Amino acid sequence: MKNGIHPDYKKFLIKVGSDVFETMSTHPAGEILMDVDFRKHPAWNKDIGNVVNQSNKSISDFNKRFSGLSFGSQKKEAS
């Protein structure tokens, strides 16, 4: 390996609320403060995704308006 061409690999702190995670990185700063907790993101937590979707007025209105709409084959009731 050539000397002087690679960035320094050092301890790096990730701070999320009161939690601190220690890892290694070449990032020039020694730490990063996260505003949003990645563990509570809807992409990683299915329960939270449902809460977010239900609280969003646009999605809620759409679901109310088209709740009876279905795709695929269904048996029609005889009249």
UniProtKB/Swiss-Prot annotation:
GO molecular function: rRNA binding; structural constituent of ribosome
UniProt keyword annotation of Kinase present: no
Cross-referenced Gene3D superfamilies: Ribosomal protein L31
GO CC annotation: ribonucleoprotein complex; ribosome
Keywords: Ribonucleoprotein, Ribosomal protein, RNA-binding, rRNA-binding
An individual GO BP term: translation
UniProt keyword Membrane, yes or no: no
Quaternary assembly: Part of the 50S ribosomal subunit.
Record's function text: Binds the 23S rRNA.
Family: Belongs to the bacterial ribosomal protein bL31 family. Type A subfamily.
Record protein name field: Large ribosomal subunit protein bL31
Gene: rpmE
